[in-house]
Each structure stands twice: as structure tokens, then as C-alpha cells.
């Protein structure tokens, strides 16, 4: 897999923060970091250092593996707007979609944990005009999504999640 090495530092980040992000964006490092993040998030119910990643809130997203058929849990940055929760499959601008996004696209069944609140969600992938309408809001909230998208050949998948009616 090719990793875009020459993504310039955005103006909104400090040099040291950007350097660390660039050093840790290899898939193997992301995978190991995600496992540790899931464990500490669950233990703390998302309190303390586990809630914010790169300055944006983090949830735990559990999907059904499109190949394995088993539950897979990953941390993901999100934007909550009322009852709507948005997640973006950016994976730091790597040249492939994150597994969780491919899982949601193939099997739109998921659960999320935001701090101590766990619930099943309805999943809708936003494409075309629906994606275009929300993209400026998402990138204003978390500028890294927009910055990485500028330097990535693939279009990041965007999903809207809503609490499943009981």
C-alpha cells in the first residue's frame, strides 16, 4: 500500500503534533493503537484522554466484519448533531478505506458507544448531494478530514448513524 508521504502540515496544527501524526499513520501502528484505545475507552467509559483524539470526540464503533462475520470494534472521530452522529472513513488519508467503513457499507448493522452510552444504530451511507451537503459542516468541525481529503485519491465514506428505535 502506498502512503502519501508528502502531505503538508496544515496551518491549524503545531509542528510536533503533525510530526507525531505522520509517524503513527502506518496501518500496523493504527491497528495496534486502535486496540489499546478500545480497551482504555471501555475501561474508562470514554472519560479522560480516551474521549478526544486529535482534538475531536471519539466513539467506539462496532461493525460486523464483511469477511469474518464477527463483531469488530474501532475508535472513530465523530460529529454529533442532535440525534445524528456522523463518522468519516478517513483513516488519516491512507489510500484505502478503513475496514470499519467497508464493513458498514457491506453490512449496515452497527453499535456505538459514546462515553458510557451504548446503543444500536441505523446506518446510512451518504453519497452525492447528501454527502456534499454535510461535508462542509464535517470539515469545519474536524479540519483534518478536509485536509486529508485534499491529498487522497479516494473519496472518504461518510455515514450517518441514528439510535435504532426500540
Residue ranges and their predicted role:
Residues 48-49, 145-149:
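Short helix-to-loop capping/linker segments positioned immediately adjacent to catalytic or ligand/cofactor-binding
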Residues 59, 157-159:
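Short beta-strand micro-motifs in enzyme catalytic cores
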Residues 2, 8-21, 91-144, 151-154, ...:
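Short, structured beta-strand-loop surface elements
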Residues 54-55, 149-153:
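Short coil/turn segments at secondary-structure boundaries
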Residues 81-83, 117, 166:
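Short strand-connecting beta-turns/loops that link adjacent beta-strands
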Residues 55-92:
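Short beta-strand segments
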Residues 23-66:
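Short, conserved active-site entrance elements at the starts or edges of catalytic domains
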